[in-house]
């Protein structure tokens, strides 16, 4: 029973770190990346639809994103959705494709982005710690029910703590790499 709690906690911690990595992909670091548009929803025939489902997105240059809609009539809607998403980007529409030039980041903007990265890192750590707390609670219930001994409880609790430390270190490493990427000029 205790092994199942450990396995479940481990999987949940892995998911928390994966979600953090996906969240960081939307933080732009001066280079063009299609992932900045991941959360942009276009009102397409009355239904909110992700840009990636409506267009081919390419990165021909380090600071340029080209969006080529599959349906040319949706180009205006895509442009409006990008502006409405308030990503600090200015799309230019030439009738067939939308080009987004990424301006060079100022020192102040870089520092702001690092703060955002740190905030996301803290949220990910809290998520990992919540999984630890839930796992420990489940183990205590098993011990109360007599399914595991007090020694087993202590051992499993230590194992969950080791996993927690491992995943928090992973979050710190990911954050450090992203901060380094952002601060590169």
Curated annotation (Swiss-Prot):
Any one Gene Ontology BP term: translational termination
Gene Ontology MF terms: ribosomal large subunit binding
Presence of the UniProt keyword Protein biosynthesis in the record: yes
Record keywords: Cytoplasm, Protein biosynthesis
SUPFAM superfamilies per the UniProt record, alphabetical: Ribosome recycling factor, RRF
Entries under CDD domains matching the protein: RRF (cd00520)
One GO cellular component, as annotated: cytoplasm
Protein task: Responsible for the release of ribosomes from messenger RNA at the termination of protein biosynthesis. May increase the efficiency of translation by recycling ribosomes from one round of translation to another.
Family: Belongs to the RRF family.
Name of the molecule in the record: Ribosome-recycling factor
Lineage, highest ranks first: Bacteria, Bacillati, Bacillota, Bacilli, Bacillales
């Amino acid at each position: 029973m205790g092994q199942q709690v450990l396995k479940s906690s481990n999987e949940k911690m892995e998911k928390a770190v994966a979600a953090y990595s996906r969240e960081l992909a939307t933080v732009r670091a001066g280079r063009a990346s299609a992932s900045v548009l991941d959360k942009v929803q276009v009102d397409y025939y009355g239904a909110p639809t992700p840009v990636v489902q409506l267009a081919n997105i390419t990165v021909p240059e380090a600071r340029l994103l080209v969006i080529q809609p599959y349906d040319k009539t949706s180009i205006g809607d895509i442009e409006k959705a990008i502006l409405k998403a308030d990503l600090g980007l200015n799309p230019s529409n030439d009738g067939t494709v939308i080009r987004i030039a990424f301006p060079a980041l100022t020192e102040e903007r870089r520092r702001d982005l690092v703060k955002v990265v740190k905030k996301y890192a803290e949220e990910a750590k809290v998520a990992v710690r919540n999984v630890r707390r839930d796992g420990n609670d489940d183990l205590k219930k098993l011990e109360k029910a007599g399914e595991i001994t007090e020694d087993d409880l202590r051992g499993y609790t230590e194992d969950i703590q080791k996993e927690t430390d491992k995943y928090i270190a992973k979050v710190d490493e990911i954050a450090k790499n992203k901060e380094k990427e952002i601060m590169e000029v």
